[in-house]
């Protein structure tokens, strides 16, 4: 099995790769401000969504911790959901900046989307820790994969 530390390293690496690549391709994003006041309303609504998602993540972590023993998948789930919570906090913190530059705006939106993907992945690993009908697990795995591929496609489309 893959070690949990390696999973964390890959997940953090993917997140860091996106804004670094955006800055490399478009260095003006460091100095530009968002183009309209609508972007600030997007930032505010995303911060509100991050708080709601954070509450869901905390409930799931508490549910896992209430169990008697923690296996590999429970530990992996808690780790991924902890990363998810960290990115949600980053989303909220970035909303506090008044004169948001485009790179911070994109970083906030990316953090929120990425935390959603981590939430979906964490729930998938939580399902793996229980003996359920494999059809349920495969169906959910399909949706998780579709979500990841859609996000990757979106980021690649934005970059190029």
Task: Enumerate the language-model features and the residues they cover.
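Alpha-helical transmembrane segments of integral membrane proteins
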Residues: 1-6, 69-160
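Hydrophobic transmembrane alpha-helical segments in integral membrane proteins
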Residues: 1-17, 48
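Alpha-helical transmembrane-segment detector that highlights a single hydrophobic TM helix
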Residues: 10, 23-24, 62-75
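Hydrophobic cores of alpha-helical transmembrane segments in multi-pass inner/ER membrane proteins
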Residues: 12-17, 51-60, 119-122
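Membrane-water interface of transmembrane alpha-helices
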Residues: 15-31, 86-100
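N-terminal leader/targeting segments
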Residues: 20-28, 44, 48, 104-107
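Membrane-interface helix-loop junction between the first two transmembrane segments
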Residues: 23-40, 69
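Transmembrane alpha-helix detector for multi-pass membrane proteins
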Residues: 38-69
């Amino acid at each position: 099995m893959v070690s949990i530390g390696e999973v964390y390293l890959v997940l953090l690496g993917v997140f860091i790769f996106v804004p670094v690549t955006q800055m490399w391709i478009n260095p003006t994003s460091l100095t530009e401000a968002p183009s309209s006041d609508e972007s600030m309303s997007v930032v505010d609504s995303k911060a509100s969504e991050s708080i709601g998602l954070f509450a869901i993540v905390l409930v799931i972590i508490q549910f896992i911790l209430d169990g008697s023993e923690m296996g590999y998948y429970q530990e992996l789930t808690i780790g991924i959901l902890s990363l998810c919570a960290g990115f949600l906090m980053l989303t909220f913190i970035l909303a506090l900046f008044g004169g948001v530059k485009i790179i911070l705006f994109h970083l906030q939106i990316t953090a929120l989307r990425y935390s959603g993907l981590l939430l979906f992945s964490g729930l998938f690993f939580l399902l793996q820790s229980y003996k359920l009908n494999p059809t349920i697990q495969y169906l959910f795995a399909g949706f998780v994969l579709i979500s990841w591929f859609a996000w990757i496609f979106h980021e690649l489309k934005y970059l190029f």
